A protein has these predicted regions:
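Primarily recognizes the serine-hydrolase "nucleophile elbow" in alpha/beta-hydrolase
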Residues: 193-265, 500-567
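Loop/turn elements at helix/coil->beta-strand transitions in domains of secreted/extracellular proteins
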Residues: 112-115, 142-145, 205-208, 229-233, ...
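Alpha-helix capping and helix-loop boundary segments enriched in small/acidic/polar residues
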Residues: 123-134, 167, 175-189, 211-222, ...
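Hydrophobic helical h-region of N-terminal Sec-dependent signal peptides
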Residues: 5-7, 11
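Cap/lid segment of the alpha/beta-hydrolase catalytic domain
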Residues: 108-192, 199-200, 241-250, 438-505, ...
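Catalytic-domain carbohydrate-binding cleft regions of carbohydrate-active enzymes
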Residues: 212-214, 221-225, 236-244, 269-272, ...
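Anion (oxyanion) recognition and catalysis
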Residues: 140-141, 274, 529
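Alpha/beta-hydrolase-fold serine-hydrolase catalytic core, especially in secreted/extracellular enzymes
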Residues: 11-96, 111, 283-433, 438-444, ...
């Protein structure tokens, strides 16, 4: 009866979205304060090394296998001022990546070239997005070789689930979380393997490789500059702000941007910049969805820490361009100029004065425009499937792993409010039957678990572009906010079940029976795993498919049902 006693002692305040996010923002402020307080270079290097290693573990960087790239050139086209080589490579066996390599004109620039990887943002057409290929074109016209590729679910890299872009990223993340991974685990691997490919080219100086990206690609280029020491200069655009400045107006973003308990172990935008170990240009936009006020405040922290550490002038820079969230002409020019300065030692203005009018065929690598149609194709879902089978991932296993999370929720302040929703037949001396997830039958009791029905309270104001989770209008915002807090919506609901069980036992003299319907069967399994004697018996009706079966059939598995199950194991 430990859980019931702990819950009875707890204060009662429902974990509204505002309150969860305010706690995350407070932790982000603390992280900023810790970087602001770094006194000297030795302290900065120590803190950088600690964050870098923790971040690499969260990303799964050390688990990236350097399998054969099997890179194949599928043709080169000469555009006069530059050439484009179409390359097909594998970031993992059968996981094809379509790459465009922009090569400077040999008559003007001699190899080996300094180069950079460009990571596209959330565009359905991936590497073919106009502003992204223009960045690579400008780089080639200026003497830099670059490789731009399709991230998962974009361009030619549909994974066969009928989803695109952010929807695919979130779906991958829901499954990856059950393995202690994120979508970023797989997206970073792609970026690292493209750097491997660049470094293997005889026309590239492997000691002079940079990273560039916009929006979601700004996110991944920021991750890459921290994780991969081969990156010698980086220009993330339309991402680096401050986590709290973006979270409040826009809500949690798709899953490659969310880490389990990340704020507690130091995930923070200033940390990304100061832990990179290379020069960084923060490209921001005045009207960005990633608020420019956050970019400016983060840059002030970076400048202060850099000055105390004696970093070279111009090592870190902030550029604010007018206009909205996009890889604008100003961003392109400043990014290429920054890369030229730090990769080639050239200090000069870069102006974009002409562009080639690219057609669809110019940017397509595969014959049918889809890697999924190639012989030997392996989707990321098939890779996840193999891991699920090898590790025996199941609701029962996750419930056992998450026992500590459930007990912690019982001892907190959030689970007791459920008692106010308890209704139905409760008679002293008569065993109660508690039903969750469906309408109570005659003679049964029921209750409303958190973030269900009237107990779902969304953020009071969202002024920015709503996240995927907010747009769905479900409890997924709560689940992701709790996930980032090192908690679990499923574990919280399981704690509420145990609170209800303790109350029903107190009022009737018997442990209640439990009937759990639909996805609440998973919640019930968490509760039983945490306290086996809480219920006299349990019945599961209309259970969801086992995780592995759902993955095989490409069923969507929402964060509320699975991602929130991650136990931090």
């Amino acid at each position: 009866m430990l859980c019931g006693i702990l819950c009875a002692l707890a204060l009662t305040t429902a974990p509204m979205v505002d309150r969860i996010e305010e706690a995350l923002c407070a932790r982000d402020r603390l992280n900023d304060a810790e970087w602001s307080a770094v006194p000297d270079k030795a302290a900065l290097l120590e803190k950088r090394a600690q964050f870098k290693e923790r971040f690499r573990r969260a990303l799964g960087y050390h688990a990236i296998q350097r399998t054969p790239l099997n890179a194949r050139s599928l043709g080169v086209r000469d555009y006069g001022a530059f050439r484009i080589e179409k390359v097909l490579m594998e970031s993992a066996p059968g996981e094809f990546v379509a790459v465009l390599v922009f090569i400077p004109a040999a008559g003007r620039f001699a190899p080996p070239y300094a180069g950079f990887v460009f990571i596209p943002g959330h565009s359905d057409n991936g590497k073919a997005h106009e502003t992204y290929i223009r960045t690579c074109e400008l780089g080639a016209r200026s003497g830099l070789l670059s490789a731009i590729y399709d991230p998962l679910g974009q361009g030619e890299r549909s994974q066969g689930a009928g989803l695109r872009c952010a929807d695919e990223h979130v779906r991958i993340g829901a499954y990856a979380a059950l393995l202690g991974e994120t979508t970023a685990t797989y997206m970073l691997r792609d970026a690292v393997r493209v750097v491997d490919y660049l470094a293997s080219r005889p026309d590239v100086d492997s000691a002079k490789i940079g990273a560039c990206g916009n929006s979601g690609g700004g996110t991944l280029s920021a991750y890459l500059m921290v994780a991969d020491d081969r990156i010698r200069a980086a220009t993330p655009s339309c991402y680096l702000s401050s986590a709290r400045e973006h979270l409040v107006p826009c809500g949690p973003q798709d899953s490659e941007q969310n880490f389990f308990d990340g704020f507690s172990w130091g995930f923070n935008h200033a940390a990304l910049v100061l832990s990179a170990g290379c020069p960084v240009l923060m490209n921001a936009a005045a009207e960005d969805v990633f608020p420019v006020a956050g970019s400016r405040s983060t840059y002030e922290i970076v400048k202060t820490a850099a000055a105390r550490a004696g970093m070279p002038e111009g090592w870190y820079e902030l550029s604010v361009a007018p206009g909205p969230h996009m890889m604008s002409k100003i961003h392109r020019e400043r990014a290429v100029a920054f890369l030229l300065r730090h990769l080639r030692g050239e200090v000069r203005e870069v102006s974009e004065t002409e562009n080639f009018d690219f057609g669809g065929d110019d940017c397509t690598v595969t014959p049918d425009g889809e890697v999924s149609r190639l012989a030997g194709f392996t989707s990321v879902y098939e890779e996840l499937e193999r891991k699920f089978a090898a590790q025996g991932v199941s609701a029962e296993q996750e419930a056992r792993n998450a026992r500590g999370l459930v007990i912690r929720e019982c001892g907190g302040t959030d689970c007791r409010d459920v008692l106010a929703t308890l209704r139905g037949r409760i008679v002293e001396g008569e065993r109660a039957v508690l039903r969750v997830g469906g309408a109570a039958e005659p003679g049964e009791a029921t209750a409303t678990l958190f973030a269900e029905g009237p107990r779902y309270v969304p953020r009071t104001h969202r002024s920015g572009k709503l996240s995927y989770y907010d747009r769905r209008g479900t409890d997924e915002v709560v689940a992701v906010d709790l996930y980032m807090s090192g908690r679990s919506l499923v574990a919280l609901r399981a704690a509420e079940l145990l609170t209800l069980a303790a109350e029903l036992r107190r009022r009737t003299g018997f442990a209640p029976a439990l009937v759990a319907v639909g996805r609440f069967a998973t919640v019930a399994k968490f509760a039983v795993a945490a306290q086996a004697d809480a219920f006299s018996q349990t019945k599961y009706l209309d259970e969801p498919k086992p995780f592995l079966d759902a993955l095989k059939s490409r069923d969507y598995l929402s964060f509320a049902d699975s991602g929130a199950l991650y136990s931090g194991k």
